[in-house]
C-alpha cells in the first residue's frame, strides 16, 4: 500500500474501529481519526482519506443501521471487511481503585455488553459517543472518581490502569466492519484471501409477492444469502429497500445469471461491493 494512503475511522486512538483498520491494513497504516460515521463518509468523498472503516454488524447488538444509510446512495463502495473481537475492561487513572469510582463512561453498547458486571456496584453509567473517547475524557479531565469501559489497548493508550478485565457478558462477541472507498476513487488494496461475499441493495415494488420472487430467484441460482435487512426506501411512505449479503463473488456465473432475472422484478438493484469475507481475529 502506498505511504500516501490514509484510512479514516470514527473515534479516538484505541477505538474498535482503529483495531479493525490495523487488522486489515497493518499497524503502519496512516490513519485519520474523525468524530462520527458521517465524517468518515465525508473524508472519503472529499479526498482526505482513500479508505474508511465503518461498523456494520455486531454479534450481540445486530446491524449498525447508520452505516447502511451512509452507503445507501452508492457514493461509497465496499472493498473489504474486518472482524474484530469485543474485549472489554474497566479502567481508571493510576491510583484510582474500585471503591473510588462513582460513575462509569462508555459507548451505550459497551455499557450494555458489560451490564452484569457494572450492576454489581451502584455506579452511575454515562453514555459517550465511543469507548476510546471515554478513556481520553477521563485522562484529559483528570477524573479520579470515574472509570471507563473500553478495550485493553485503548486503556493503555490513554494512560489508564485496568481494574477488571473480561467484563463483557459474551466473550465471543465480535464486530464486523466494512472497508470502504469512494466509487470515484482509483485507490487500490492488495489482493486478499477469503470466501467471496457480495452486498446488494434491492428495491421491490409494493405489491404482493415481490420480495418472495426475489428470494426465490436467488435460491434457484444456488446462491446462499447470509444476511437480509430492510430500511425505509426514502422514496415513498412505508416503502422499503433490502440489503442482502450473498455468499458469491460478483463475477460468479450463478450470481450474474440471478442479477439478470432480478432486474425484471425489482425497482432498484445495485451491487454495493464484492469482497472477501473477513476472518475473525
Feature names for model-found ranges:
Residues 1-281:
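Domain-level signature for soluble enzymes in the chorismate/prephenate branch of the shikimate pathway
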Amino acid at each position: 500500500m502506498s505511504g500516501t494512503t490514509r484510512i479514516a475511522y470514527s473515534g479516538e486512538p484505541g477505538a474498535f474501529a482503529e483495531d479493525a483498520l490495523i487488522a486489515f491494513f497493518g499497524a503502519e497504516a496512516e490513519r485519520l481519526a474523525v468524530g462520527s460515521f458521517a465524517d468518515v463518509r465525508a473524508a472519503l468523498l472529499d479526498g482526505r482519506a482513500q479508505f474508511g472503516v465503518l461498523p456494520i454488524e455486531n454479534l450481540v447488538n445486530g446491524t449498525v443501521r447508520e452505516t447502511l444509510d451512509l452507503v445507501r446512495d452508492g457514493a461509497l463502495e465496499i472493498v473489504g471487511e474486518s472482524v474484530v473481537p469485543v474485549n472489554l475492561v474497566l479502567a481508571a487513572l493510576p491510583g484510582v481503585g474500585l471503591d473510588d469510582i462513582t460513575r462509569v463512561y462508555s459507548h451505550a453498547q459497551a455499557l450494555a455488553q458489560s451490564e452484569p458486571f457494572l450492576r454489581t456496584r451502584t455506579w452511575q453509567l454515562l453514555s459517550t459517543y465511543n469507548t476510546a473517547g471515554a478513556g481520553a475524557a477521563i485522562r484529559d479531565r483528570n477524573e479520579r472518581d470515574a472509570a471507563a469501559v473500553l478495550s485493553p489497548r485503548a486503556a493503555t493508550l490513554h494512560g489508564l490502569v485496568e481494574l477488571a478485565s473480561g467484563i463483557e457478558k459474551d466473550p465471543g462477541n465480535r464486530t464486523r466492519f466494512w472497508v470502504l472507498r469512494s466509487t470515484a476513487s482509483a485507490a487500490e488494496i492488495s489482493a486478499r484471501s477469503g470466501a467471496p461475499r457480495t452486498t446488494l441493495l434491492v428495491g421491490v415494488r409494493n405489491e404482493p409477492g415481490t420480495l418472495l420472487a426475489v428470494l426465490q430467484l436467488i435460491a434457484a441460482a444456488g446462491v446462499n444469502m447470509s444476511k437480509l435487512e430492510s430500511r425505509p426506501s426514502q422514496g415513498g411512505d412505508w416503502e422499503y429497500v433490502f440489503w442482502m449479503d450473498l455468499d458469491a463473488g460478483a463475477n460468479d456465473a450463478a450470481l450474474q445469471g440471478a442479477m439478470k432475472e432480478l432486474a425484471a422484478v425489482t425497482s432498484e438493484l445495485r451491487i454495493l461491493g464484492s469482497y472477501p469475507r473477513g476472518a475473525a481475529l
